[in-house]
Regions:
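Short, Lys/Arg-enriched N-terminal segments with co-localized hydrophobic residues
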Residues: 2-14
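Conserved alpha/beta-domain cores
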Residues: 12-166
């Protein structure tokens, strides 16, 4: 039998698919352990710094949820890739970039201040939509990381609970 030499892109696709199956199997096993349905788990493919072509390879494996760390990359990808992709902004978000994210990201995972929540709320109201957000919590208390201390979360949620648009 002849040795088959794979083109680099073909090999990458095989590895991506293999890794995806491994991750999906790990999700199923973890869910079985804790009595949870795997359908309740959302697998988000983190696309930071990856080219659009690679995202399309994962997209072709029926993955529709993508997470991006950088605003400009998310904007470029969201505006040029298929519209059924669900985008998650998972990186630190600065208030001056909120206008680019609200309306493109289906979920903002990194709300770490009242001022950022206000900016998201105001932009969502302007665009007549609701922006889904998650609160970033710095559970390890690392100085170089963003997020609320665990004991600050409840107060933050109370402060923003009446904000429209989020």
């Amino acid at each position: 039998m002849k040795n088959k030499i794979f083109h680099t892109q073909e090999w990458r696709i095989i590895m991506l698919k293999d890794n995806l199956v491994t991750v999906q199997n790990n999700i199923v096993k973890a869910c079985e352990k804790c009595g949870r349905s795997p359908k309740e788990v959302c697998l988000i493919a983190v696309s930071k710094t990856k080219p659009k072509e690679m995202l399309m390879e994962i997209y072709d494996c029926n993955i529709r949820q993508f997470g991006e760390n950088y605003v400009q990359e998310m904007v470029d990808k969201a505006d040029s890739l298929p519209k059924d992709i669900v985008w998650h902004m998972i990186g630190h978000l600065q208030r001056n970039k909120v206008k680019y994210v609200v309306g493109r990201a289906d979920m903002i995972h990194s709300v770490d201040s009242v001022r950022l929540a206000e900016a998201i709320s105001n932009e969502a109201i302007k665009k007549k939509l609701v922006a889904d957000i998650l609160v970033e919590v710095n559970v390890a208390g690392e100085e170089n990381k963003f997020g609320f201390k665990p004991d600050e979360v409840e107060d933050f949620i109370r402060k923003i609970s009446d904000y429209k648009g989020i």
